[in-house]
Design a protein with these regions (language model features):
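Short glycine-/acidic-enriched loop or helix-start segments at secondary-structure transitions
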Residues: 23-24, 30, 83-86, 107-108, ...
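Acidic, Mg2+-coordinating phosphoryl-transfer loop and its flanking beta/alpha structural elements
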Residues: 76, 268, 291-336
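Catalytic phosphate/metal-binding cores of nucleic-acid and nucleotide-processing enzymes, i.e., regions
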Residues: 16, 36, 91, 300-302
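Active-site phosphate-binding/coordination module
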Residues: 53-206
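Glycine-rich phosphate-binding/hydrolytic loop that grips phosphoryl groups
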Residues: 336-359
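Active-site neighborhood of HAD-like aspartate-dependent phosphohydrolases
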Residues: 7-12, 16-74, 80-82
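Conserved acidic, metal-coordinating active-site core of Asp-based
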Residues: 158-165, 169-179, 183, 187-309
């Protein structure tokens, strides 16, 4: 946290894609570029050619939260290498979570100091944005939460074989590995045993850049698997044939598998107690309910949204999230016909700031 001025102990957890970062149609983005709009930052193209944008105002509002002593955390299901590549364009945060909760990193501004857990090869140089204070441009390294890593890398979870040493390079993901990733068939741990079982059934698995999770994408499957993928999604939602030690979440035709102690809600539980160790004793659910806001948009955010005090949805990408918003007064959609994408994100952040301000004045 950049300040401890806030007397109201609150934290904000935010998803990234569809929440802070948006993907306008190519023609709209090109028009913005032609108009030389400097209130938007353009992220590097993804492997599929998509290019996200984040607004300068979004970045300023996130920094305002931190200036008021509110811990701000980015929580994504993306692989760690993807998160590392995008960090220069994202809000500075008090913690960064990748792989659906599997890995936690903290910023370290002492870039020349070697500390336990430092991520080799990652030095983040933040990109400037409109209204950016000079302090936001200071480079930083990342330090992994070794307590969390030690728990999640035991053999009942993900094991230790998925971790690789990284080195920066030019390229689509910005990183290469100094140690080649261990193939799935050589990885120990309950997670990878399940992965091998799914491979035997014909599923194509994506484990590149993941140490504590893997993804199954409908688009990557052979025709016979793709034709019955909806049934597979339903089975996963019902936890059919999912080992007790594992968790899973579905989103936009993908399924992520990870250790049961992982997942977005569980990592939020862990971090809120780390930020506020005395909050509400040891009652995890009350701690999040009383002290956390979240920003999110899709199916793999549902548990996190329900666990927090209030969830704000700048966009809604699934019917289940739309239904959740209609059924719960604590799930608020900020998107309207006139206010979409970055404008809806900015509105959500302003609502959180206003609520915190009211709480502080009581």
């Amino acid at each position: 946290m950049t300040s401890s001025s806030s007397s109201c102990k609150m934290a904000v957890f935010s998803d990234i894609d569809g929440t802070l970062v948006h993907y306008p149609p190519a023609q709209v983005m090109q028009q913005d570029i032609d108009d030389n709009k400097n209130d938007l930052l353009y992220l590097p193209p993804s492997k599929t050619g998509q290019r996200g944008v984040i607004s300068s105002k979004t970045l300023r509002l996130c920094q305002q939260l931190r200036n008021e002593g509110v811990p701000f955390v980015l929580v994504t299901g993306a692989r760690s290498t993807t998160l590392f590549q995008r960090l220069p364009y994202l809000p500075r945060a008090d913690a960064y979570v990748s792989e659906s909760g599997g890995r936690i990193f903290y910023p370290n501004s002492s870039v020349n100091d070697m500390v336990d857990g430092m991520v080799d090869g990652v030095l983040v140089h933040p990109q400037p944005y409109e209204g950016c204070p000079s302090s936001d441009l200071e480079p930083f390294t990342l330090v992994e939460d070794l307590l969390w890593r030690n728990e999640i890398s035991n053999l009942d979870c993900a094991g230790t074989d998925g971790y690789s040493i990284l080195a920066p390079r030019a390229g689509s993901d910005g990183f290469s590995t100094l140690t080649p990733p261990t193939p799935i068939d050589q990885r120990s741990g309950k997670l990878w045993a399940h992965a091998r079982n799914l491979q035997k059934k014909g599923f194509f698995l994506d484990s590149s850049g993941y140490a504590t999770a893997f993804r199954i994408n409908r688009k990557h499957q052979e025709d016979d698997i793709a034709s019955t993928f909806d049934e597979f999604l339903e089975q996963c939602n019902n936890r059919e044939a999912v080992p007790e030690e594992l968790g899973c979440s579905t989103n936009l035709g993908c399924v992520d598998f990870y250790p049961k102690m992982s997942g977005k809600k569980n990592v939020c539980d862990y971090l809120i107690r780390k930020f506020f160790p005395c909050s509400n004793g040891n009652d995890e659910s009350i701690t999040l309910k009383s002290h956390a806001y979240c920003l999110c948009d899709d199916d793999n955010d549902v548990e996190m949204a329900l666990a927090c005090r209030t969830a704000y949805l700048p966009s809604v990408t699934s019917e289940s999230m739309r239904r959740l918003a209609s059924e719960s007064k604590n799930v608020i959609v900020t998107e309207t016909e006139e206010r979409k994408e970055s404008l809806a994100t900015e509105a959500a952040l302003e609502m959180i700031l206003n609520d915190i301000s009211k709480s502080n004045s009581i």
